[in-house]
């Protein structure tokens, strides 16, 4: 019987590593679902560490996972799914042509091509031939995707001089010396890992993206964040999850927040005292306030943090 080869280990702790673990597990589960390998060949985990086979991590598989995980944000995928239908509505035809010029990546491939009803195969062929490029450029530049969490120029990079995560990185050409003690950049210390590219998959897909660093165990880490992954109103789900989790949480819980309109991560601690209040409340029913409009609905002011915090 061939021995399992797990050549990498990641431990929970710092939220970045906990989030990377959640993202890696989702990626490996995707490979398992594709039939690439059995889970037992891809990874295993105990309470506080993940072991995995790095040979199954590739740029192509990563991008194909991105396409599936963030499918609603992949313009080419929306076009492809519509064109594979037998009949198209007028609204769908309009949507196709809007998507063909939705961002720079789409424009670079399709140019002035418009769907006419007779060029279906041409468009599908261009998508297939340029799939990985379309995914990569849409993903790394997407304001709700990779660039919300990390420097878009550092995707798939290695041996960086700074951490790839936003607000953890800096322009070393301009500010490198000022980061070190007494203008000596050799004293500047940082930590970057290629596995940080998996962090976006750990956060909820909402405007205010949340990651719950409930790292009492990797099992609970996965469970806590699965509740909020696709929630339309993440704050409501987050508070509800805390109430459901109160029975087994006996400590302060770190919640990481990354809003699309801020270029830094925020940390919120849900204190044990507050968790105990959730535990005692049988009728706790917090409803998150998504938007509060003033005079202009096109420019809503996001009020919930102001009201709740």
What residues fall within each predicted segment?
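Intrinsically disordered, low-complexity regulatory regions
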Residues: 229-309
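Short, flexible coil/linker elements and helix-boundary hinge sites characteristic
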Residues: 35, 85-87, 131, 215, ...
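Conserved small-residue
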Residues: 1-145
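Intrinsic-disorder/low-complexity loop/linker signature
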Residues: 48, 143, 160, 188, ...
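Alpha-helical protein-protein interaction elements
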Residues: 7-9, 61, 160, 231, ...
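Basic, glycine-/proline-tolerant helical and adjacent loop/strand elements
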Residues: 95-242
């Amino acid at each position: 019987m061939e021995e399992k080869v797990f050549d990498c280990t990641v431990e929970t702790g710092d939220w970045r590593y906990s989030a990377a673990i959640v993202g890696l597990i989702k990626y490996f589960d995707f490979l398992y679902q594709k039939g690439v390998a059995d889970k037992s060949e891809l990874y295993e985990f105990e309470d506080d560490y993940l072991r995995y086979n790095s040979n199954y991590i590739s740029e192509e598989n990563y991008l194909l996972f991105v396409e599936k995980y963030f499918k609603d944000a992949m313009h080419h995928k929306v076009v492809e799914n519509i064109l594979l239908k037998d009949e198209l509505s007028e609204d769908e035809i309009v949507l196709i042509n809007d998507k063909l010029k939705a961002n720079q990546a789409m424009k670079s491939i399709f140019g002035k091509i418009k769907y006419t009803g007779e060029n279906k195969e041409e468009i599908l062929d261009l998508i297939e031939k340029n799939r990985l490029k379309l995914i990569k450029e849409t993903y790394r530049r997407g304001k709700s995707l990779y660039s919300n969490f990390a420097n878009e120029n550092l995707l798939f990079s290695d041996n960086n001089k700074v951490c790839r995560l936003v607000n953890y990185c800096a322009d070393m050409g301009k500010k490198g010396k000022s980061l070190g003690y007494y203008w000596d950049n050799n004293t500047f210390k940082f930590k970057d890992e290629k596995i940080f590219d998996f962090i976006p998959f750990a956060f909820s897909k909402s405007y205010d993206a949340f990651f719950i660093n409930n790292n009492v165990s990797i099992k609970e880490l996965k469970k806590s964040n699965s509740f909020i992954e696709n929630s339309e109103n993440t704050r409501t789900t987050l508070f509800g999850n805390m109430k459901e989790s109160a029975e087994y949480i006996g400590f302060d819980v770190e919640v990481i927040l990354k809003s699309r309109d801020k270029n830094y991560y925020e940390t919120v601690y849900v204190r044990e005292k507050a968790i105990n209040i959730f535990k005692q409340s049988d009728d706790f029913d917090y409803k998150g306030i998504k938007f509060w409009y003033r005079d202009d609905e096109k420019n809503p002011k996001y009020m919930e943090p102001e009201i709740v915090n």
